Regions:
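Short-chain dehydrogenase/reductase
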Residues: 1-11, 44-48, 70-71, 109
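Flexible, glycine-rich beta-alpha linker
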Residues: 1-2, 23-46, 68
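Active-site Tyr-X1-5-Lys
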Residues: 1-31, 51-56
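A generic fold-level signal
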Residues: 5, 22, 42-45, 54, ...
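A generic local structural motif
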Residues: 16, 47-48, 129-130
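Histidine kinase transmitter module recognition
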Residues: 20, 38-39, 91, 157
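C-terminal substrate-binding subdomain of Rossmann-fold SDR/epimerase-dehydratase oxidoreductases
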Residues: 54-202
Length: 202
């Protein structure tokens, strides 16, 4: 499909420039799966759209409820990017490659509908009903990224399962919806806890 082809074309263009014009510069590309986590309010993204529907008490429109996406918590993604940046600094020539960051467990394959159902269980606020519409453009039913290079070269793998990523994300947005919690403090505490987990696993 055009979406997937565009990603492959981007990698070909980066590789061509890296080898042809930037031979003295070491460039890596990084691509993550479908990222969820507190603090995201972008439009046309499933979790922010869900939170807006709760605030506005309006139906949530889902285009592809049965499509599977590689869901990943934002802290797992950022940790991977930091590891890649460190590797580029330490071993620039060998790190100048294309890296994917995504779940590597098939148990983490959640459909869009399953994500919403999981949030329904975790959020303390009632979720408005969902409306299903046909997508205007073709989209793949099943998207997955191969993160084996990041696993092998950066020793990276996601700390969170999809269920845990949903739990952490729902907790952050619960705090946001209550309007009585210091979100900066909550975010810093989440980062600190995440780093404690990574340090204990290393």
């Amino acid at each position: 499909d055009p979406y997937s082809a565009s990603k492959a074309m981007a990698e070909l263009a980066i590789s061509a420039y890296r080898k042809s014009f930037f031979d003295s510069k070491y460039i890596a590309s990084a691509r993550a799966g479908n990222v969820i986590g507190g603090g995201d309010f972008a439009r046309y993204r499933i979790v922010p759209d869900l939170i807006r529907s709760i605030e506005e008490q309006s139906p949530l429109t889902l285009r592809n409820p049965h499509s599977t996406r590689p869901w990943l918590h934002v802290l797992d993604v950022l940790y991977g990017y930091l590891l890649l940046g460190k590797k580029l600094f330490e071993e620039p020539e060998s790190a100048a490659q294309a890296f994917n960051f995504a779940p590597d467990r098939t148990a983490d394959d959640y459909t869009v509908k399953a994500i919403i159902e999981a949030f329904k269980d975790k959020l303390s606020t009632e979720i408005p009903k969902c409306e299903f519409t046909k997508p205007k453009h073709h989209e793949s039913k099943y998207l997955k990224l191969d993160s084996s290079l990041a696993n092998r070269f950066l020793y990276w793998s996601p700390i969170f399962t999809t269920a845990q990523a949903i739990e952490w994300t729902a907790r952050w947005y619960d705090s946001y919806l209550k309007k009585t919690v210091n979100l900066k403090k909550t975010t810093i505490e989440d980062i600190q806890t995440y780093l404690e987990i990574t340090n204990s696993d290393s």
